């Protein structure tokens, strides 16, 4: 007989999520899952700017569930005042099979079309490509997310409009999805750099999964030799501005710099930060609360 779990769901103010998650891990002895988090790991503080989120904890149903629920309700009541004081809905309990717990998250990941011809699909999902489609396979069970966050989509859409760049540099490569897309779109040479060695490992696995060759390094940006037809940077606005000089220096004459990871409220800050870069702002795209800027080296 399949093992069952008692799934306890708590809908709480977003600010209470981390505190509640820690409490539930200690209470249950198991991990928790959090709905309403971005499906890509690109976030500012780890959680989207949403009013509420759902935290799910998993208990052995043979334990005293009434006692566990009472402790959770007491915890929520004690902490509600610190987060606006509005009543927090009572936790709900659902019995689920072990298999459902292990694989149920997969229902959220489906093939996603980005731009005209780029498609991101989970490894387990069948997909019939249309003529000209460039399919990128990812396993979202790995670190660094699914690649469908708005910041990534905006970058991919901008990249697709630039045709077939010869040399591409992906700064802060993460999952490697932008680098993989550059190869798929015809780039001859692609370098992906990230200060996180774990990101480079994951990016390498994703490149192998897609059968593409990308040079993956942890080399600091300023030490990477040469200039590139396209430079991609999907990182926080503050880091973009801090690196403005080094990023601009890597763009070849006639080449482009694509900047993403920018909250729209920080767009002006980034534009000002690149005001002395010597590059011309040629395009701006937005999705929800995110902006993407495209610069060109007119030299």
Curated annotation (Swiss-Prot):
Pfam families found in the cross-reference section: PrmA (PF06325)
Record's keyword annotation contains Membrane: no
First-listed, main subcellular location of the protein, grouped into a coarse class: cytoplasm
GO biological process, one term: methylation
GO molecular function, one term: protein methyltransferase activity
Reactions catalysed: L-lysyl-[protein] + 3 S-adenosyl-L-methionine = N(6),N(6),N(6)-trimethyl-L-lysyl-[protein] + 3 S-adenosyl-L-homocysteine + 3 H(+)
EC number annotated for this UniProt entry: 2.1.1.-
Residues that, per the record, bind S-adenosyl-L-methionine: 152, 172, 194, 234
Gene3D superfamilies: Vaccinia Virus protein VP39 (3.40.50.150)
Xref: InterPro entries: Ribosomal_L11_MeTrfase_PrmA (IPR050078), Ribosomal_PrmA_MeTrfase (IPR004498), SAM-dependent_MTases_sf (IPR029063)
Entry keyword set: Cytoplasm, Methyltransferase, S-adenosyl-L-methionine, Transferase
GO CC terms, sorted: cytoplasm
Cellular compartment(s): Cytoplasm
Family per record: Belongs to the methyltransferase superfamily. PrmA family.
Role description: Methylates ribosomal protein L11.
Protein name, entry field: Ribosomal protein L11 methyltransferase
Recorded name of the encoding gene: prmA
